[in-house]
Curated annotation (Swiss-Prot):
<dbReference type="InterPro" id="IPR011335">
    <property type="entry name" value="Restrct_endonuc-II-like"/>
</dbReference>
<feature type="binding site">
    <location>
        <begin position="48"/>
        <end position="55"/>
    </location>
    <ligand>
        <name>ATP</name>
    </ligand>
</feature>
<keyword id="KW-0234">DNA repair</keyword>
<keyword id="KW-0269">Exonuclease</keyword>
<dbReference type="InterPro" id="IPR027417">
    <property type="entry name" value="P-loop_NTPase"/>
</dbReference>
<keyword id="KW-0067">ATP-binding</keyword>
<protein>
    <recommendedName>
        <fullName>ATP-dependent helicase/nuclease subunit A</fullName>
        <ecNumber>3.1.-.-</ecNumber>
        <ecNumber>5.6.2.4</ecNumber>
    </recommendedName>
</protein>
<keyword id="KW-0413">Isomerase</keyword>
<comment type="subunit">
    <text>Heterodimer of AddA and AddB/RexB.</text>
</comment>
<dbReference type="GO" id="GO:0003690">
    <property type="term" value="F:double-stranded DNA binding"/>
</dbReference>
<keyword id="KW-0378">Hydrolase</keyword>
<dbReference type="InterPro" id="IPR014017">
    <property type="entry name" value="DNA_helicase_UvrD-like_C"/>
</dbReference>
<dbReference type="GO" id="GO:0008408">
    <property type="term" value="F:3'-5' exonuclease activity"/>
</dbReference>
<dbReference type="GO" id="GO:0043138">
    <property type="term" value="F:3'-5' DNA helicase activity"/>
</dbReference>
<keyword id="KW-0227">DNA damage</keyword>
<dbReference type="Pfam" id="PF13361">
    <property type="entry name" value="UvrD_C"/>
</dbReference>
<keyword id="KW-0547">Nucleotide-binding</keyword>
Length: 1210
């Protein structure tokens, strides 16, 4: 029986914190980390700043729970993504392996091994995955079959929605309240024939409701909340009046700052106050008085009077000019007044739209129920449906809910700031009320588009601080990722930018970043942050037509800095990352980097497969085969590299029109041109005629084949007939292009296997996907490791990079949502723009109607909240981007240097940029420049630098210095002549040709797996064929003379030494350098070979990888360097031979075998060696299975030829 240690008391935790503080460990845990790891028995909210080690804390807390007797399956651990869950599971697995290796207690070893085995069944995953488990198990309790599937295909969802919508639309158009419903549709679509805008409204309302904890209740009780509440001027929320008063006071303060300027001119030459100064003083005094005494002078009932008074008081313009510099003092106040000025008129008509909203509410409710009924009938659901089913199961079944609450010792949540209300409800139901552990950072909440609500985190933070009995807040402020240059600039920017009004959190001492180690505080002057702006004063039109995209000059600035980093400081490309706000409009980056020879890889995930050039060419080829009279597709095929017709050729063909026909397609003109019966046969010269004959002959053969063969075979026939697959291999991004073409054939094959046959149906399916603005995901290829990374800010979250470039800082934030005809809000419900008929108000008699689009009061309230929420999320996006950097951060943008000016005088301002200014500025660049202008007297830890065209010439940018790949001392490598190389190639070719006909004659009695492995390498290598040795006789060997003076250690000798070392290495001892050196003395190799072995890499394998720890944990089951022999049949000669070899290592268990093989080959990508040795490991597995009659369940390659050991499962 194991005696587990109890959980630590608060006193014991304090004692542990003291011990850690004075320990001599190189890496110490902070007091807050220790508190977060060991505190138990209450709800805990961990506010973990960027780089503070929150994942480390979670893993350590889980391990501590396990060591104190809490089984892993009694912990509920929620992660935001499947990838995060996998990484967390792997970290826990590694910790358990390490703990097993360190533990001497046998019973504890058994217990930890059981935890290791339970890890794969533990509840570590996304909320969606857990909800599926609940519904699969208990769905019967609410009438849901356990045999359901998830509708992940958006196209399938859209088809079902459209069917439901069309049916309901017809019903509502023929009901009793049809006139009101028609008015509703016209308000959004303009007429009842085009229902697309109204349909989009319904779909959006439905999707929004699905993110709430109970969609039906939200639609019934909250959907019309603001429409029912805000019907009079007195109903305006206090918060909105406060914003108006704040804008008035800000205006007074800014005006006072301007009047205090030295050049303002308060006095006339006679010494009296100037008229301008007197007027401005009156404005300042009255605005301040009205703000201070608002309740006494006006109150809510007099709000309209206040608006009139302020409008009459301030000038109609926005600016105050001092010394020819304009200061937009009144701009924000004018914007606020505009919101309130027409409220009386709006409120007069707003009541007319309420019946329309009731109709909309009814329609969305019925649509939701009907859509769900269809999905239940199909037994196919969306993720949100499954989550709501899980909530319903737990709410309606007390026994099920209590069983979960009793089962889970703790409910743990990672990335808590990105939860939505549906997920929060599910977590509440799983918890017993005092066992929640939540980790997150509100400053990194960037998933509002997924309905994530950072206020859930914020409310918990406030509640726990005010009422400690509800839970404990632990702040992890220390950053262990970034140097002080990054931390300082982050603190400087956000202390001036972020507060609860914009950003949802006050960036005070509680949230500022602190260096976690002394090494991070060592200053590096060359790592100071840079805001590099291309001066657009003389912009020569290098920017794309869409001004939101990044310009060529901006990318050139980035290329110049990267070349400087790489050449001058030796920074590897993989240490550099470019962050962008979206995946679109980034082609210019790849194009420019290719020009400068800078390797770059993107984060993937784009859906541009059907828009890639090579796929578009093939699709147009298939369209032409299907219908040659499709001129667009035919021209694309003719112009493609397969036939290479140029503009002159097409012009000559186009003139072969038949004058008797009104409509003449290009295909008919081609046929007439070939037989010389076109309108101008003299234009068809012999060369063109030959090309046309080849084209028609090829097209005819393809069309004939399309009727007989499969799509897959047709596509490969096209590749082979015109060598298109080979052609793209010579182009830029060849690997990606060939992968795309190969995937097209596979997708066509999959299409036919799904029951659909024929080229016509395949083309229709592709065209339908394109018509709906959808696409297929790009095919992933193994990206080069030594390359600059390009990814979105969202994708970068949770990652870290030495050097970070934040691109396109001048891109305006997307505000499209606040200009839609409707805006949804969780508390207020829906707000709409109402198309009111103001004919009566105007006294108009000649026109039937005068329609004006009015922003109703609920719409205005939702719009203001949405605007602030959008700006807040953009601010948090900037925080995430900046805190990815370890060493240095760059901001890249574009601005006019001549138009750059001071925004306001720095005197008398607080720590933050004025709220009005923060709302007004709509780019990262604007925020940074405003901070630099207003707080110029402070050290902001970043420099602003304008880049001119003269700085971006080819000479100024420079070029990459190519490293010397060969050792200059190795004269043999340098002086091997091309003649000898060609001779060797010829000999190899002769040998291969002979070998093709000598299989049976020279079949050896015995072969090795290494020999057989080479049979499969031709399938992996793009050029050349490598034939295995067929005979035991020695072949002629032309030995080259050794020009080098110094002997090299052969790679094969190093491989042999490694295998010997792994065979004799004692696994019962801790694996360290001393253990390895002791074992190394016992192997039979010369000193040069022993010295060449990388012992640190071997130590890293055993200490840092789960497979290495597996070796030590299960050493009793391990067999090393085991010989084998089996009988095999030669496929060519049909003769039997003996296959002999030695297996590096395998683990023999009662019911299965785990196979391991070490490789010291050099490689660029692990996938290369996986393909190369896959067949060899299959032979080993076959031998083991024949011997032990047990399956080989796992096969691993241990790759020692790279920078670090890598484990590849084959």
């Amino acid at each position: 029986m194991i005696s587990f240690a109890p959980f630590l008391s608060p006193e014991a935790i304090k004692h542990l914190q003291e011990n850690e503080r004075y320990s001599d460990q190189s890496q110490k845990r902070t007091a807050q980390q220790i508190e977060a790891i060991y505190t138990s028995g209450q709800n805990i909210l961990v506010s973990a700043s960027a780089g503070s080690g929150k994942t480390f804390v979670m893993v350590e807390r889980i391990l501590d729970k396990i060591l104190r007797g809490v089984s892993i399956d009694r912990l509920f651990i929620s992660t935001f993504t499947v990838k995060a869950a996998t990484e967390l599971r792997e970290r826990i697995e590694n910790k358990l392996y390490s703990q097993i290796a360190q533990t001497t207690d046998f019973q504890m070893k058994v217990y930890l091994t059981e935890q290791l085995q339970s890890l794969c069944q533990a509840d570590i995953g996304t909320m969606d995955a857990f909800a599926q488990k609940v519904v699969s198990r208990y769905g019967y309790s609410i009438g849901i079959s356990s045999q359901f599937r998830i509708m992940q295909d958006k196209a399938e969802q859209d088809v079902l929605k459209q069917e439901v919508f069309s049916k309901l639309f017809s019903e509502f158009m023929n009901q009793k309240e049809a006139p009101v419903f028609r008015a509703l549709v016209k308000n959004f679509s303009g007429n009842c024939k085009d229902t697309s805008a109204f349909r989009e409204l319904v779909y959006t309302c439905y999707s929004f409701s699905q993110s709430t904890e109970n969609p039906k209740i939200w639609l019934q009780e909250n959907f019309l909340s603001a429409a029912k509440t805000y019907q009079r001027l007195e109903d305006i929320p206090d918060h909105d009046i406060e914003l108006l008063l704040l804008a008035m006071q800000d205006t007074a303060n800014q005006l006072r700052d301007v009047t205090d300027m030295e050049d303002y001119g308060q006095l006339t030459k006679a010494g009296s106050r100037s008229a301008k100064y007197t007027k401005h003083l009156t404005i300042i005094e009255k605005l301040s008085d009205w703000v201070r005494d608002f309740k006494c002078l006006y109150g809510k009932a007099g709000l309209d009077r206040l608006i009139r008074d302020v409008t009459d008081l301030i000038p109609s313009g926005n600016d105050v000019t001092v010394s020819k510099v304009k200061y937009p003092v009144f701009k924000t106040l004018h914007q606020k007044l505009k919101q309130f000025r027409h409220l009386e008129t709006i409120l007069m008509y707003q009541k007319d739209c309420f019946p329309l909203l009731e109709q909309l509410q009814d329609f969305v409710l019925v649509f939701s129920e009907a859509y769900l009924a269809v999905k239940i009938q199909e037994s196919a659901f969306e993720f949100s449906d499954i989550a709501h089913f899980a909530i319903k199961i737990l709410e309606e079944n007390t026994d099920i809910r209590q069983s979960y609450q009793q089962h889970y010792h703790e409910v743990m949540v990672d990335e808590y700031q990105d939860n939505n209300h549906m997920q929060e409800r599910l977590l509440t139901l799983l918890s017993n009320g005092h066992n929640r552990f939540m980790v997150g950072d509100i400053k990194q909440s960037i998933y509002r588009f997924r309905q994530a609500d950072p206020q859930i985190f914020n409310q918990k933070f406030r509640d726990y601080q005010k009422k400690p009995e509800q839970g404990k807040v632990i702040l992890l402020k220390e950053n262990f990722r970034s140097q002080s240059e990054v931390l300082n600039v982050s603190n400087a920017v956000f202390s001036h930018l972020m507060d609860e009004s914009v950003g949802d959190v006050s960036y005070d001492e509680q949230h500022q970043l602190i260096a976690g180690s002394h090494a991070q505080t060592v200053p590096y002057l060359d790592r100071r942050a840079q805001l590099l702006l291309y001066n657009s004063d003389k912009d020569d039109g290098n920017a794309p037509s869409d001004s939101e995209g990044i310009s060529f000059s901006e990318v050139t600035i980035v290329a110049k800095e990267i070349i400087k980093l790489h050449n001058d400081k030796g920074v590897p490309f993989e240490d550099i990352t470019l962050l962008v706000s979206s995946r679109t409009r980034n082609d210019i980056i790849s194009h420019t980097f290719n020009q400068y020879g800078i390797p770059i890889v993107t984060d993937g995930g784009q859906q541009n497969y059907l828009k890639s050039v090579e796929v578009m060419v093939m699709l147009d080829t298939l369209r032409t085969i299907n219908n040659p009279r499709n001129d667009y597709a035919l021209v694309a095929l003719l112009r493609s590299p397969m036939f290479a017709f140029d503009e002159d050729d097409l012009a000559r063909i186009a003139l072969q029109k038949d004058n008797e026909l009104d409509k003449d397609c290009l295909y008919d003109k081609i046929q007439r041109a070939v037989i010389g019966r076109g309108a101008h046969p003299e234009l068809i010269h012999d060369t063109l005629l030959g090309k046309l004959n080849v084209f028609l002959k090829t097209l005819k053969s393809w069309r004939r084949y399309a009727k007989l063969g499969s799509l897959y075979d047709l596509i490969w026939k096209i590749f082979n007939d015109r060598f298109y697959f080979d052609f793209v291999a010579s182009q830029a991004k060849a690997e990606q292009a060939q992968a795309n073409l190969y995937a097209l054939a596979l997708r066509a094959n999959q299409f036919e296997k799904s029951g659909y046959k024929g080229l016509y149906r395949f083309i229709k399916m592709i065209d339908k996907v394109l018509e709906t603005q959808n696409d297929l995901a790009d095919v992933e290829v193994a990206a080069p490791k030594q390359a600059v990374n390009l990814m979105t800010i969202h994708k970068s979250k949770g990652l870290q990079f030495p050097y970070v470039f934040i691109l396109n800082c001048d891109k305006r934030f997307s505000m499209t949502d606040i200009h839609k005809s409707f805006i949804l809000n969780r508390q207020h419900g829906i707000g709409i723009k109402y198309l009111a008929d103001i004919k009566g108000l105007l006294g108009e008699t000649t026109l039937n109607s005068v329609k004006v689009s009015m922003e109703t009061l609920p719409y205005q309230l939702n719009k203001q909240e949405l605007r602030l929420a959008t700006l807040s999320e953009q601010m948090r996006l900037l925080y995430v981007a900046m805190t990815r950097a370890e060493k240095k951060v760059y901001f890249i943008g574009k601005a006019s240097k001549s138009k750059s000016q001071d925004i306001t005088d720095p005197k008398k301002l607080g720590k933050l940029l004025p709220l009005a200014l923060r709302e007004q500025l709509l780019t990262f660049q604007d925020w940074l420049l405003a901070i630099a202008d207003i707080f110029s007297t402070e050290d902001l830890y970043f420099d602003v630098r304008f880049i001119e065209d003269s700085d971006l010439t080819q000479e100024s940018v420079g070029r990459l210095q190519t490293p010397q790949l060969l050792n200059p001392d190795d004269l043999k490598d340098n002086r091997q002549s091309e003649t000898i190389a060609r001779a060797l190639d010829m000999l190899e070719a002769v040998s291969q040709l002979n070998a093709n006909y000598e299989a049976a004659i020279h079949l050896p009695t015995v072969r090795t797996p290494s020999q057989l492995k080479a049979t499969y390498e031709p399938l992996l290598e793009p050029i050349g064929v490598d034939i295995i040795e067929k005979s035991s006789r020695s072949l002629s060997d032309f030995t080259l003379p050794h020009f080098s003076k110094k002997a090299k250690v052969e790679a094969s000798h190093i491989g042999s030494a490694l295998h010997q070392l792994m065979q004799v290495l004692p696994l019962s001892k801790p694996i360290n350098q001393q253990t390895l050196l002791d074992a190394l003395r016992g192997i039979d190799s010369n000193e040069e070979v022993k010295t060449a072995l990388d012992l640190k890499k071997i130590e890293s394998f055993f200490c840092d990888t789960s497979l290495g720890q597996f070796f030590q944990t299960y050493q009793k089951h391990l067999y090393r360097e085991a010989p084998f022999a089996i009988l095999k049949l030669d496929p060519i000669s049909q003769e039997e031979y003996v296959l002999r070899g030695i297996i590096d290592a395998y683990f023999l268990f009662d019911d299965h075998i785990v196979l391991v093989d070490y490789k010291t080959d050099k490689y660029k990508q692990p996938i290369e060696l996986k393909k190369r040795y896959q067949q060899q490991l299959e032979l080993y597995a076959e031998a083991l299975t024949q011997t032990y009659k047990l399956p080989v369940t796992k096969r691993y390659l241990v790759l020692m030829g790279g920078g670090k050991p890598e484990i590849v499962e084959v």
